[in-house]
Amino acid sequence: MTSTLVLASASPARRQVLRAAGIDPVVRVSDVDEDAVAAALPPDTAPATVVVELARAKAAAVAADIPEYAADCVVVGCDSMLLLDGELQGKPHTPEVARARWAQMAGRSAELVTGHCVLRLRGGAVVAEATDCSATTVHFAKPEPEELDAYLASGEPLQVAGAFTLDGLGGWFVDRIEGDPSSVIGIGLPLLRRLLGDVGVGVAQLWRHPAR
């Protein structure tokens, strides 16, 4: 019975979502060039497909390099991006880009899309795959100039999709959301449960203390 979930992500937030939900994931970070994967897709690729393909690339890269778990495990890859004005926005990386993003999205709403890929490994091979995308509408507040300065100086928004977090300092500047909160953080529990079921794994198998 599968009892190991390998998270193909360096995101502390994704790891914490799983831990809070009873799963202690094994963390393995892929070396996937996300920009190269996205650039290889046709220009008119739907946003949901873009994030799913990125999630699949991450999961596949990790699945190919975990011999110690390959006998029986599931590998989960995720990728999140913010869809605003018809354009996908990833991590800003610099304060200047993050400031420009906030100038664009403050006081408005945007859609946070998160691609998920679940691979089931058995006997060293991938025997099942399930993918899907979750979408959550985020309504942003208008930070005061000094608040935005402080937020950018914290460094938090530089390495997260859309230049904001829901579960950190950025939560002060989110008025409300429509959809799954865990998906905004980076890994949607309701969707992940369904995808695990699609590859034949019940979520309770993965809990630290299975229900009796």
UniProtKB/Swiss-Prot annotation:
Transmembrane portions of the chain: none
Cofactor(s), names only, from the UniProt record: a divalent metal cation
CDD domains: Maf (cd00555)
Principal EC category: hydrolase
UniProt-listed Enzyme Commission number(s): 3.6.1.9
S-S pairs: none
GO MF entries: nucleoside triphosphate diphosphatase activity
Example GO biological process: nucleotide metabolic process
Function: Nucleoside triphosphate pyrophosphatase. May have a dual role in cell division arrest and in preventing the incorporation of modified nucleotides into cellular nucleic acids.
UniProt protein name: Nucleoside triphosphate pyrophosphatase
Organism: Nocardia farcinica (strain IFM 10152)
